[in-house]
C-alpha cells in the first residue's frame, strides 16, 4: 500500500509540474514547474530503489545526481532570467526576442 501511495504522489507531482510547464507565461513559474518535475522523478527513483531492491544504492545515487543537476540548472536559469529582466523589464517568454534578427 505504501508503494502505491508514493507512486501516486509522484505521479500527481509530475502532472502538476507538467501543467505548470505547459500553461505558465512566467519564466520563474516555468522554472519552478521544471523543478517539480525533477522532484517527481527523484521520488520515483527512490521509491523503486527502496521497494524493488533495497540492498542496491543505484536509485539513491542517481537521485543525488539529479538533485545536483537540478541545483545547477536552477542557479543558471535564475541568473539568465535576472539578466533578461534587467534588459527587457519583463519575464514573459512571449516578449523575449533576444535571438531574433
UniProtKB/Swiss-Prot annotation:
Cite a GO CC annotation: chloroplast thylakoid membrane
Q: Give the EC number.
A: 7.1.1.-
Chief place where the protein resides: plastid
Q: Which GO terms describe its molecular function?
A: oxidoreductase activity, acting on NAD(P)H, quinone or similar compound as acceptor; quinone binding
Kindly state a single biological-process term from the GO annotations of this entry: ATP synthesis coupled electron transport
- Membrane spanning stretches: 2-22, 32-52, 61-81
- Cite the Pfam families for this sequence: Oxidored_q2
- Could you tell me where this protein is found in the cell? Plastid, Chloroplast thylakoid membrane
Which keywords does UniProt give here?
Answer: Chloroplast, Membrane, NAD, NADP, Plastid, Plastoquinone, Quinone, Thylakoid, Translocase, Transmembrane, Transmembrane helix, Transport
Membrane topology listed for this record: Multi-pass membrane protein
Reactions catalysed: a plastoquinone + NADH + (n+1) H(+)(in) = a plastoquinol + NAD(+) + n H(+)(out); a plastoquinone + NADPH + (n+1) H(+)(in) = a plastoquinol + NADP(+) + n H(+)(out)
Tell me the disulfide pairings in this chain.
none
Q: What does this protein do?
A: NDH shuttles electrons from NAD(P)H:plastoquinone, via FMN and iron-sulfur (Fe-S) centers, to quinones in the photosynthetic chain and possibly in a chloroplast respiratory chain. The immediate electron acceptor for the enzyme in this species is believed to be plastoquinone. Couples the redox reaction to proton translocation, and thus conserves the redox energy in a proton gradient.
Entry's family note? Belongs to the complex I subunit 4L family.
Subunit info? NDH is composed of at least 16 different subunits, 5 of which are encoded in the nucleus.
Q: What name does this protein carry?
A: NAD(P)H-quinone oxidoreductase subunit 4L, chloroplastic
Source organism per UniProt: Nephroselmis olivacea
Q: What would be the name of the gene that encodes this protein?
A: ndhE
Amino acid at each position: 500500500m505504501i508503494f502505491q501511495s508514493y507512486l501516486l504522489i509522484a505521479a500527481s507531482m509530475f502532472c502538476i509540474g507538467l501543467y505548470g510547464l505547459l500553461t505558465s507565461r512566467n519564466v520563474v513559474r516555468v522554472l519552478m514547474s521544471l523543478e517539480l518535475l525533477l522532484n517527481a522523478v527523484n521520488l520515483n527513483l527512490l521509491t523503486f530503489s527502496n521497494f524493488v531492491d533495497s540492498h542496491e544504492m543505484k536509485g539513491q545515487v542517481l537521485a543525488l545526481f539529479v538533485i545536483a543537476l537540478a541545483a545547477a540548472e536552477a542557479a543558471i536559469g535564475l541568473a539568465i532570467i535576472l539578466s533578461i529582466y534587467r534588459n527587457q523589464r519583463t519575464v514573459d517568454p512571449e516578449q523575449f526576442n533576444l535571438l531574433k534578427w
